[in-house]
Amino acid sequence: MALLLVAGCSGGSQGTSAGGSDASATVGAHMAGPAAEVHVTPEAVASIPNPWALSTPESAVRSYLDWTSYAYRIATSDVATPTMGPDEGVRVDSYIQYNIEKHQLIDQTLDSITFGAPSVGSTSTLIPTKEQWTYSYLSIEVGNKVLGGPYSASYDSTYTVVKTKKGDWVVDSVKAEALGTVK
């Protein structure tokens, strides 16, 4: 069984339906671009991260990274939007669409993260990190054949985290500097 996603221009709502051996969902309510069938394995769909923890700036960054990685893996940005502000949501959604247009998904794993001292401002908190990642590019076709990787990447990043009206912390923006080559 695999999840089939149809991505592209869509003004409709998301939904799922079971039919035969595939489940299907229409994604792309926020995306623009040519329609594409995206197949996602049941294992990828089942790899749901822990629930969002948005009570502190650091926990918000961790949740953002977990849920954004999951969104990239299943080509569905909406699952991660509660961890981020609207502008960051557009950026994540655009990156998913970019990968779909290249007929690929990205499967990434955060291997390690070290948090630096936060800089607390009047409206936001800056959280510096050092991150180690492993990632692969997978085909959007049935079976999700590995197209490239696994690769490793290291980043020095700074997360701007803001508090919402509900009192949750969310990632408003990310500045990431690759330390070495990223493929």
Regions found by a protein language model. Give the residues of each.
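Exposed beta-sheet edge and beta->alpha loop/turn motif
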Residues: 13-17, 21, 122-183
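Juxtamembrane and targeting peptides
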Residues: 1-59
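Core segments of small alpha/beta cavity-forming domains
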Residues: 34-108
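Short amphipathic beta-strand and strand-loop transition segments with alternating hydrophobic
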Residues: 112-122
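Short coil-to-beta-strand transition motifs
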Residues: 105-110, 151-154
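Glycine-centered loop/turn positions within well-structured domains
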Residues: 7, 78, 167
